[in-house]
Amino acid sequence: MTQLTHINTAGEAHMVDVSAKNETVREARAEAFVDMQAATLAMIIDGSHHKGDVFATARIAGIQAAKKTWELIPLCHPLLLTKVEVKLEAQPEHNRVRIETCCRLTGKTGVEMEALTAASVAALTIYDMCKAVQKDMVIGPVRLLTKSGGKSGDFKVDI
């Protein structure tokens, strides 16, 4: 089994030293879902929600969250992201919104946490904007879809 990288030999949490790593292009994709009633989703789709464009707000929130991941997750490195993309898709057949994020950089550490944070915060923003009309929305699952670059190799979730 692989060792936990954020725990040192004394069992203490620490930030991983990446100074000796090579810079490579690294990319990660993540997804999240927000399940809701058909009427709530219809308000988002037709733009009749009183708070405005839910998707535009969630997209910007996800992008901002990716850029601030290092401030939210204690042992994450501050990263110079070169791409953050947040796609939102209404799925009326499932009464939900699907969020897919992509983060990329050329650097010494991966961007999985940035992609996951972007997806999570976009989902939370949808909840926040729609909670006045529906409080029992469900967020999840949130998961990593792919990662590439770095010495640990590539990852792709089995769908």
UniProtKB/Swiss-Prot annotation:
It catalyses: (8S)-3',8-cyclo-7,8-dihydroguanosine 5'-triphosphate = cyclic pyranopterin phosphate + diphosphate. The active site is at 128. HAMAP family: MoaC_B. Pathway: Cofactor biosynthesis; molybdopterin biosynthesis. The keyword Nuclease does not apply. Homohexamer; trimer of dimers. CDD domains: MoaC_PE. Gene3D superfamilies: Molybdopterin cofactor biosynthesis C (MoaC) domain. Transmembrane segments: none annotated. This is Cyclic pyranopterin monophosphate synthase. Belongs to the MoaC family. Catalyzes the conversion of (8S)-3',8-cyclo-7,8-dihydroguanosine 5'-triphosphate to cyclic pyranopterin monophosphate (cPMP). One of its GO terms (molecular function) is cyclic pyranopterin monophosphate synthase activity. Its EC number is 4.6.1.17. Keywords: Lyase, Molybdenum cofactor biosynthesis. The gene is moaC. GO terms for biological process: Mo-molybdopterin cofactor biosynthetic process. Coiled coil: none annotated.
